[in-house]
C-alpha cells in the first residue's frame, strides 16, 4: 500500500482559499495560509476545529451503516493483503480518522460505458452542490450506445472539480482517478497528477481484461504506477457479498458496483449519503428491491472506507463563498430549456419546440416535454427538415417557435431557416455543436459551426448569432435569443456545444420578476389609414408587424418569394429586391445598438488581448487570472453576440497591439475579425474533441506574449545591413518551405501510416518524403540542377526590376517543381509495385522511363536557353 500523503494542491489555489478565509475570519492572508498548510497536523488549533466540525455529519451516516450492514459484508474482504483491517474496527477507525482541509480537488470516474460512471459523477456533483461547493464538470463518453466492453474505445468518464472558491473549469488534471477496469486505467492514467490518488477495482484486473486493454503485463506489477498512491478495492466481491440477501440476477447485482465506488469517494471527501439515498428511493420507487440493493451497495462502499485503515486520511473541501440566494446544479441543455420557457412566459406566448433527436441536443427535447404546465408543446418530427418547417408554421400562428439540432441537422434546416428569414418570422434555432464534419464526433465538443451559422444559407441571408459561454449562461443566452427574435422579427441561431450542454455548475436561480418583459410585434389592427400593410416597418427596429391567421382584415401573403416593401405582394422588381436585401441586412446590423458592449477584463494596460467566444470563456478567464497573478500583463474579452458584434468592438481592438484568439476550430472567429476590422490576430486552435484547460491556455498565451515584439527584429536588421545577401538567403531558404508546406507532426503521422501499409521502416519513408533528398537515383539531376541553375537569375531579376510580373515568374518554378516531384514519386511507387517479368509490364516500365528521360532532356535545353 502506498504511503499516505496529502493531495498535490497548486499554489494559486492555496492563495485563493487563504484570501477567502482571511476575508471571512478577519485575519491576515499570511495567517490563513499558514493555517491551511498546517491543518493536517493535530498539534495545531485549526485541525481541532476542523475535526470537531467534520465528525458531526460523518457520525450520522456511520450509525446508519452499522444498523443496515449487520452482516460482516465488509469485514471478510478487508482481511486480504490489500488492507490491514483485522486490527481495526469502525470505532477505532473514526477515532484515528484525520481530515485535511483542501481548497479544491478534481476527481475523475472512469469505466466501461455500462458501468454507470456518468451516474456516479452526477450524484457526487449534486451532493457537493447541495453542500455548498462551487464546481464544474466534464462528462466524456463514447458515441456508441453500447461501446465494446473492456476496450479503451469503450471507456466512459466523468470529471468534476469542487472548490471552496469561485471556479470556471472542471480542472486541468484529476487529483483522484477511480478506474473500474484496465481499459479505464490505460485511457486516463497519463492525466493523473503526480502523487495523485488512484483507486482501482482490483476484481476487473484479470488476464482477459488486461490484454483487451492493450497491456502486455499487469500494469499493477510494472513501474507505470510508481509515483501514484494506489488503492486496490475488490468492488465486485464487495457488491456480491453485500447483495447476496436480495433476489437479483448476477448481472443485475454487478451493476451496483458503481455504488461501491460512490460510497467510498463520499467517505474519502466527507460527503453525506442522505441525498443520494433519497434520489435512489425516488428513482426506483416502483422497484423497491432494487432501491434497497443500491443503497446497501452505497453504504458498503462508505463502510469500506471507515473500516480500512488506508482510507483513514480523508479530505474536506469547505463551502464556497457564493452570493446569497437559492442555487441548483444545472447543465447547459437544461439551462437553455428553462431560458426558452422564461422567454415565452415573459412574452406571454405559448412555446413550440420542434425537433428530431440528435446528440447532443436531444436532452432539450426531453426537458421541455416535462413542462406542459407552462404551455410548452413539443413535437418530435420524422426528420430535421420537418422539425424546422413545423417551427416556422408555429411562428406564423403566433407561437414562440424554436427548433433544435446539432451540426448535421443545421445543414438540413438551412433552406427552411432561409424561408423564415424571407418571411421575416421570429424563430430560435438552437445548434449544440459537436465535432465534424458529417457524423464526426457526436459526443465531443467543437466550435466549428460558427462560419456555417453566419453564412450557411443561400442568397444574402444575414441573421443574429448568439453563443452560450457556460452551462448557467445558457439560460440567459436562450432568453436573449428569444428577445431578439421577437423584437426584430427574425430567425436567431443560438450556438451551444457539447461542453456547455453536458457540463454542469451551480446556478443562482434568478428572480423571475426581475427578468425583462419581452414585447412582441403582434397586432390585431390596421397599421395605416389605408388598411393593413404586412411589410410596413417599425422605424426603430425595422421589424414588420406580426399578424396571425384568423384576424379579420389582416390577411396577407408570406413565403419564400421576394415581397414588395410595404404591401407584401410578390415582386420581381430589381430595385425592390435591392432595397429589401439592404433593409434585411440593416435590421440585423442595427441590433448592435441593442446589446451589451464588449467588456475588457484583466490588465487593461496590457498590449495583449485574449479574445474568445462561447464555451472557451472559463478556460480563458482562469488562464488570464493566473497570468495576472504572476505579473504577466494580459487582458481578455469575450463575445456572446457574434453577429452582429457589439458596437464598441472596433474601439476595443484598437487598444491592443496583439490579439490572441483561442478557439475549438481552425480559426473561424479570427477570419471574421480580420475581414471585418482589418486586424491581425494570432490563433490558438484545437480540434481534439476536448475543451481547453486553463493550464494549457496559460502556457500557450505566456509563450506567445514572450515572442511578441522580438520575432521580427532580427529579420529587419538583416535586410538593412546586407540587402543583397538577405534576398538570396530568403530565396534559398523559403522556397524549400513552400515546396513542403506541411506541418512536421502531419509529416510524421503520414510517414508512420505509409510505413505500416508498405511494411517498411519509418526512416525510409521519411527519407523518400524529404524535400532535400531524392526518392530514387534517377531524380538526382532534377533536384540538384533546379535550385542552382534556376534560382539565381530569378533573384537578380527581382532585384533589378520591381514590377509584379518577374515576381510572379519567380514563383512558377516552385510550383512546377512541386508538381514534378509528386509525379515522379508516384511514378517510382508504380514501378516498384509492377511485376517486370510480365511482357506488358516491361513495356510499361520502358515507356515511363523513356518519357521521364525525354522530359529531363527538354529541361536541360530550357536551362541552356535561359542562360
Functional labels for PLM-detected ranges:
Residues 40-91, 714-739, 767, 771-846, ...:
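Acidic, proline-/serine-/threonine-rich low-complexity intrinsically disordered repeat tracts
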Residues 94, 101-194, 338, 343, ...:
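Thiamine diphosphate
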Residues 171, 225-228, 232-236, 444-491, ...:
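Conserved thiamine diphosphate
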Residues 1-33, 39, 726-767:
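Intrinsically disordered, low-complexity regulatory segments in eukaryotic proteins
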Residues 86-347:
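Active-site cofactor/cluster-binding pocket
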Residues 64-67, 76-85, 279-312, 547-588:
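Helix-enriched interaction subdomains in cytosolic or periplasmic regions
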Residues 104-105, 241-243, 310-325, 343-350, ...:
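Gly-rich Lys/Arg/Thr-decorated short loops/hinges at beta-loop-alpha junctions or inter-strand turns
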Residues 322, 330-339, 347, 477, ...:
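Flexible, low-complexity linker and terminal segments
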Amino acid at each position: 500500500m502506498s504511503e499516505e500523503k496529502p493531495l498535490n494542491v497548486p499554489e494559486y489555489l492555496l492563495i485563493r482559499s487563504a484570501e477567502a478565509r482571511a476575508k471571512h475570519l478577519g485575519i491576515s492572508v499570511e495567517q490563513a495560509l499558514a493555517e491551511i498548510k498546517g491543518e493536517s497536523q493535530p498539534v495545531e488549533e485549526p485541525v481541532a476545529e476542523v475535526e470537531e466540525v467534520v465528525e458531526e455529519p460523518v457520525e450520522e451516516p456511520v450509525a446508519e451503516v452499522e444498523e443496515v450492514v449487520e452482516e460482516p459484508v465488509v469485514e471478510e474482504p478487508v482481511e486480504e493483503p490489500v488492507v490491514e483491517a483485522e486490527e481495526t474496527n469502525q470505532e477505532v477507525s473514526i477515532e484515528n480518522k484525520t481530515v485535511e482541509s483542501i481548497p479544491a480537488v478534481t476527481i475523475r470516474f472512469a469505466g466501461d460505458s455500462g458501468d454507470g460512471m456518468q451516474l456516479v459523477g452526477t450524484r457526487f456533483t449534486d451532493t457537493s452542490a447541495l453542500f455548498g461547493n462551487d464546481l464544474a464538470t466534464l462528462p466524456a463518453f463514447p458515441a456508441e450506445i453500447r461501446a465494446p466492453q473492456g476496450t479503451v474505445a469503450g471507456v466512459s468518464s466523468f470529471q468534476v472539480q469542487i472548490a471552496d472558491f469561485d471556479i470556471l473549469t472542471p480542472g486541468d488534471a484529476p487529483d483522484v482517478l477511480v478506474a473500474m477496469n484496465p481499459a479505464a486505467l490505460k485511457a486516463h492514467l497519463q492525466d493523473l497528477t503526480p502523487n495523485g490518488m488512484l483507486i482501482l477495482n482490483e476484481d476487473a484486473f484479470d488476464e482477459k481484461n488486461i490484454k483487451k486493454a492493450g497491456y502486455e503485463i499487469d500494469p499493477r506489477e510494472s513501474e507505470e504506477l510508481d509515483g501514484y498512491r494506489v488503492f486496490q478495492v475488490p468492488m465486485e466481491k464487495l457488491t456480491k457479498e453485500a447483495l447476496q440477501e436480495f433476489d437479483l440476477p448476477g448481472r443485475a447485482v454487478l451493476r451496483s458496483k458503481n455504488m461501491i465506488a460512490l460510497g467510498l469517494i463520499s467517505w474519502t471527501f466527507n460527503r453525506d449519503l442522505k441525498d443520494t439515498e433519497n434520489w435512489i428511493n425516488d428513482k426506483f420507487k416502483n422497484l423497491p428491491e432494487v432501491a434497497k440493493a443500491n443503497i446497501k451497495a452505497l453504504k458498503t462502499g462508505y463502510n469500506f472506507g471507515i473500516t480500512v485503515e488506508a482510507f483513514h486520511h480523508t479530505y474536506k473541501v469547505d463551502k464556497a463563498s457564493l452570493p446569497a440566494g437559492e442555487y441548483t446544479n444545472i447543465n447547459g441543455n437544461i439551462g437553455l430549456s428553462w431560458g426558452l420557457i422564461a422567454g415565452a412566459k415573459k412574452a406571454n406566448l405559448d412555446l413550440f419546440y420542434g425537433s428530431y433527436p440528435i446528440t447532443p441536443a436531444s436532452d432539450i427535447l426531453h426537458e421541455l416535454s416535462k413542462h406542459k404546465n407552462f404551455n410548452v408543446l413539443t413535437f418530435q418530427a420524422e426528420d430535421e427538415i420537418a422539425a424546422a418547417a413545423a417551427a416556422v408554421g408555429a411562428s406564423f400562428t403566433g407561437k414562440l417557435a424554436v427548433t433544435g439540432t446539432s451540426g448535421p441537422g443545421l445543414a438540413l434546416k438551412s433552406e427552411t431557416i432561409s424561408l423564415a428569414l424571407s418571411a421575416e418570422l421570429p424563430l430560435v434555432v438552437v445548434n449544440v455543436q459537436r465535432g465534424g464534419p458529417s457524423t464526426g464526433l457526436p459526443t465531443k465538443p467543437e466550435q466549428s459551426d460558427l462560419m456555417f451559422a453566419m453564412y450557411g444559407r443561400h442568397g444574402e441571408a444575414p441573421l443574429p448569432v448568439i453563443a452560450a459561454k457556460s452551462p448557467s449562461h445558457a439560460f440567459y443566452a436562450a432568453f436573449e435569443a428569444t428577445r431578439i427574435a421577437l423584437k426584430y422579427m427574425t430567425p436567431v441561431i443560438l450556438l451551444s456545444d457539447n461542453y456547455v450542454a453536458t457540463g454542469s455548475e451551480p446556478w443562482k436561480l434568478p428572480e423571475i420578476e426581475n427578468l425583462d418583459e419581452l414585447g412582441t410585434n403582434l397586432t390585431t389592427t390596421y397599421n395605416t389609414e389605408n388598411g393593413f400593410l404586412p411589410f410596413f416597418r417599425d422605424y426603430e427596429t425595422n421589424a414588420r408587424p406580426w399578424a396571425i391567421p384568423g384576424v379579420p382584415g389582416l390577411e396577407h401573403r408570406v413565403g419564400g418569394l421576394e415581397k414588395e416593401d410595404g404591401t407584401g405582394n410578390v415582386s420581381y422588381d430589381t430595385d425592390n429586391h435591392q432595397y429589401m436585401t439592404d433593409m434585411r441586412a440593416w435590421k440585423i446590423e442595427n441590433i448592435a445598438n441593442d446589446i451589451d458592449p464588449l467588456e475588457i477584463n484583466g490588465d487593461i494596460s496590457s498590449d495583449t488581448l485574449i479574445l474568445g467566444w462561447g464555451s472557451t470563456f472559463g478556460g480563458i478567464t482562469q488562464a488570464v487570472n493566473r497570468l495576472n497573478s504572476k505579473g504577466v500583463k494580459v487582458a481578455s474579452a469575450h463575445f456572446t453576440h457574434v453577429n452582429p458584434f457589439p458596437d464598441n468592438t472596433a474601439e476595443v481592438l484598437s487598444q491592443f497591439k496583439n490579439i490572441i484568439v483561442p478557439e475549438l476550430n481552425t480559426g473561424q472567429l479570427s477570419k471574421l475579425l480580420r475581414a471585418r476590422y482589418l486586424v491581425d490576430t494570432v490563433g490558438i486552435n484545437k480540434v481534439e474533441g476536448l475543451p481547453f484547460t486553463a493550464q494549457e491556455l496559460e502556457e500557450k498565451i505566456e509563450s506567445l506574449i514572450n515572442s511578441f515584439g522580438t520575432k521580427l527584429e532580427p529579420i529587419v536588421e538583416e535586410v538593412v545591413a546586407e540587402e543583397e545577401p538577405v534576398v538570396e538567403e530568403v530565396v534559398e531558404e523559403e522556397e524549400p518551405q513552400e515546396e513542403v508546406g506541411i506541418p512536421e507532426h502531419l509529416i510524421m503521422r503520414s510517414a508512420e501510416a505509409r510505413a505500416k501499409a508498405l511494411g517498411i521502416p519509418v526512416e525510409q519513408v521519411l527519407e523518400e518524403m524529404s524535400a532535400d533528398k531524392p526518392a530514387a537515383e534517377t531524380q538526382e539531376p532534377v533536384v540538384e540542377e533546379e535550385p542552382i541553375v534556376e534560382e539565381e537569375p530569378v533573384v537578380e531579376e527581382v532585384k533589378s526590376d520591381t514590377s509584379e510580373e518577374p515576381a510572379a515568374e519567380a514563383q512558377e518554378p516552385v510550383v512546377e517543381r512541386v508538381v514534378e516531384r509528386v509525379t515522379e514519386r508516384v511514378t517510382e511507387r508504380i514501378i516498384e509495385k509492377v511485376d517486370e517479368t510480365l511482357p506488358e509490364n516491361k513495356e510499361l516500365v520502358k515507356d515511363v522511363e523513356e518519357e521521364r528521360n525525354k522530359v529531363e532532356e527538354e529541361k536541360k535545353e530550357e536551362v541552356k536557353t535561359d542562360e
